[in-house]
């Protein structure tokens, strides 16, 4: 039922083979124009198609949008024959309530055993595609990334689908969440994590201890990992375990260059 996409590029190839991808080669502006084109296209029957903007003003990096904007594309993203059956399976997992106490946890353990069968796999950094090009210090320039501004009254451009990786102060808990990031300048962003999110809870621990918190961000990950950034999982279940479950194979991770965290 499940298929493990190695990366976003492989998913794009499947979308194109299924007639679900529209390529735009004309130059487009990341400030308002991309979001306007998407908004009009998404109103078409069945949510239109996924759009790949290949020529974005000011950047050499293409932008994919509307990749999950229809039932068919969601089915393709998870390799599911029946999206309804697949979503019912997910619902049974994310609604699990983990009781207090050892025996209560043991009784419920069977319900999440399938999720825990697929732990992340740590790869050698030399084989990591996300570290083929590395910028350090003054080389860092976020304007190289085509971050879009969606609405006229937005405070600026926002990274809207970042996978944000953090860990607790004692290092025993990990979190991957999808939190919007406003780009302020070439090497500074804001982080919008709500008070009830794990990333915010971890940040509170570090602030109370007067310590800096390490954060890693992945952009353009595989479909399963992107979904898991928003999944309402049971307490204590690391999102990348769930990503492995959806993929049917442990998510491949690599240690970051400048922080003690791992990313896809």
Go through each PLM region and give its residues.
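Extended, highly charged
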Residues: 1-264
């Amino acid at each position: 039922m499940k298929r493990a996409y190695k990366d976003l590029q492989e998913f794009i190839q499947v979308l194109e083979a299924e007639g679900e991808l529209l390529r735009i080669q004309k130059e487009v502006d990341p400030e308002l124009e991309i979001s306007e084109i998407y908004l009009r296209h998404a109103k078409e029957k069945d949510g239109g198609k996924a759009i790949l903007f290949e020529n974005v003003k000011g950047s050499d990096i293409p932008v994919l949008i509307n990749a999950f904007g229809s039932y068919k594309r969601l089915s393709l993203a998870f390799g599911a024959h029946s999206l309804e059956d697949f979503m019912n399976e997910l619902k049974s997992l994310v609604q699990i309530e983990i009781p207090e106490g050892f025996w209560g946890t043991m009784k419920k353990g069977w319900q999440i055993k399938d999720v825990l069968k697929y732990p992340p796999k740590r790869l050698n950094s030399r084989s990591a595609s996300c570290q083929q090009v590395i910028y350090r210090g003054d080389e860092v320039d976020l304007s190289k990334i085509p971050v879009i501004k969606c609405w006229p009254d937005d405070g600026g451009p926002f990274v809207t689908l970042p996978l944000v990786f953090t860990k607790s102060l004692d290092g025993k808990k990990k979190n991957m969440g999808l939190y919007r990031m406003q780009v302020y300048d070439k090497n500074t962003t804001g982080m919008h994590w709500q008070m009830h999110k794990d990333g915010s809870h971890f940040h509170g621990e570090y602030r109370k201890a007067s310590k800096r918190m390490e954060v890693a961000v992945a952009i353009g990950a595989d479909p399963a990992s992107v979904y898991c950034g928003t999944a309402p999982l049971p307490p204590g279940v690391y999102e990348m375990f769930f990503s492995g479950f959806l993929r049917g194979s442990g998510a491949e991770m690599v240690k970051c260059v400048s922080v003690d965290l791992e990313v896809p």
